[in-house]
Each structure stands twice: as structure tokens, then as C-alpha cells.
From Swiss-Prot:
Single GO MF annotation: zinc ion binding
DNA-binding as UniProt keyword: no
Organism: Mycobacterium tuberculosis (strain ATCC 25618 / H37Rv)
Cofactors demanded by this protein: Zn(2+)
Note: Was identified as a high-confidence drug target.
InterPro entries: Carbonic_anhydrase, Carbonic_anhydrase_sf
Protein name (database record): Beta-carbonic anhydrase 1
Length: 163
């Protein structure tokens, strides 16, 4: 059996008690951008219930064009008005450089990626960079609150980053 098979079995239990359908717009009108790290249980750490928030995840909580696309849809079509960014301590993005990563892929495949992994040496500074990317973006302008945090994987606490 695979892990996917285990998860499918879990879904049977989940579906048996499912209370749907929920409205499409998130009830708390908030979008959260977070790192994909498996140690971050965004729903539990913030006490989010189903249907309350959009949660957008990628490697490093990097504000990429695709994150901007998702935030623009979240705001303009589904009414979100707050944005939270969630980086964390001990992030894998702190452990390599873009050039080394791209070179390793090229050595293995013969093709150098055209995209950037956007690694960074400092999570706090990257939160600031991410906040600035959103602040200056002409497509993501409908928010009344934009805040960034670093989650401490050792303590479970969120530390707010000042811009």
C-alpha cells in the first residue's frame, strides 16, 4: 500500500462527517501565503476552520507571479481583504543557492531551468521582500491588511516582521 492509499482510506472517514457545501468565498475574507514545509499546519496554528481562508503554498512562501495570480483572483473575485505571509525558521530555502540548485539540475538532466527557485539567506528579510512585492503590485490592491510572520518551528510561535 502507498501513502496515497492510506490517505484515500482516511478520506472515507472525512467524507462521512462532511458538512458541505460551503460558500466559495472565504468567510473570514483572508488569504494566507505560506511555505509548503510539512511542519507548518497553517490551519491548526491559526485556528482556521474549513471555508474561512484561502491558503496558498509554495516552496519558501515566495511571492511569485503565480502567487500574485492567486491573490488577485482571491481579492477581485472572491472578496478577500487581508493577507498574511507565513515564512518559518529552519527553512530549506536557506540551505542552497539558486545557481547551485540550477547547476545540479542541469548536470542531471542536461537542461538548465528557466525559472528561479528564489532561495534566500535570511527569512526575516525575505518576509520584508515579499511584503514589498505585494505592496507595489498593481493587481493586488484590494487589501486592508498585509502582515508577515516567521513561524518558529521549535516553539510553535509566530513572530511578526515589521516592514
Amino acid at each position: 500500500m502507498t501513502v496515497t492509499d492510506d490517505y484515500l482510506a482516511n478520506n472515507v472517514d472525512y467524507a462521512s462527517g462532511f458538512k458541505g457545501p460551503l460558500p466559495m468565498p472565504p468567510s473570514k475574507h483572508i488569504a494566507i501565503v505560506a511555505c509548503m514545509d510539512a511542519r507548518l499546519d497553517v490551519y491548526r496554528m491559526l485556528g482556521i476552520k474549513e471555508g474561512e481562508a484561502h491558503v496558498i503554498r509554495n516552496a519558501g512562501c515566495v511571492v511569485t507571479d503565480d502567487v500574485i495570480r492567486s491573490l488577485a483572483i482571491s481579492q477581485r473575485l472572491l472578496g478577500t481583504r487581508e493577507i498574511i505571509l507565513l515564512h518559518h525558521t529552519d527553512c530549506g530555502m536557506l540551505t542552497f543557492t539558486d545557481d547551485d540548485f540550477k547547476r545540479a539540475i542541469q548536470d542531471e538532466t542536461g537542461i538548465r531551468p528557466t525559472w528561479s527557485p528564489e532561495s534566500y539567506p535570511d527569512a526575516v528579510e525575505d518576509v520584508r521582500q515579499s511584503l514589498r512585492r505585494i505592496e507595489v503590485n498593481p493587481f493586488v490592491t484590494k487589501h486592508t491588511s498585509l502582515r508577515g510572520f516567521v513561524f518558529d518551528v521549535a516553539t510553535g510561535k509566530l513572530n511578526e516582521v515589521t516592514p
